[in-house]
Amino acid sequence: MKKLKITLVRSPIGYKYDQKDTVKRLGLRRMHYTVIKEDTPQIRGMVEKVKHLVKVEEVEE
């Protein structure tokens, strides 16, 4: 199954609370922190909401 490599490249400081919450729920704790998540519609939706703050790469398992 495909996975997504998500990296926080911009700080969520100064953005709306829901965007900060989305970054937190993705598991991104600090700048340049990377997590690997399953490629599901729910995760894609979260990434779409904060696409201006993160960098996303597809990874094959």
Curated annotation (Swiss-Prot):
What Gene3D superfamilies is this protein classified in? Ribosomal protein L30, ferredoxin-like fold domain
Q: Which family does it belong to?
A: Belongs to the universal ribosomal protein uL30 family.
The keyword Ribosomal protein is assigned to this record: yes
One Pfam entry name: Ribosomal_L30
Matches recorded under InterPro entries: Ribo_uL30_ferredoxin-like_sf (IPR036919), Ribosomal_uL30_bac-type (IPR005996), Ribosomal_uL30_ferredoxin-like (IPR016082)
Taken from the UniProt entry, a GO cellular component term is: cytosolic large ribosomal subunit
Key word Ribosomal protein present in the record? Answer: yes
GO molecular function terms attached to this record: structural constituent of ribosome
Q: What is the lineage of its organism?
A: Bacteria, Thermotogati, Thermotogota, Thermotogae, Thermotogales
Q: What do we know about how this protein assembles, alone or with others?
A: Part of the 50S ribosomal subunit.
> In which organism is this protein found?
Fervidobacterium nodosum (strain ATCC 35602 / DSM 5306 / Rt17-B1)
Please give the name of this protein: Large ribosomal subunit protein uL30
Arranged from A to Z, the UniProt key words for this protein are: Ribonucleoprotein, Ribosomal protein
Q: Which GO terms describe its biological process?
A: translation
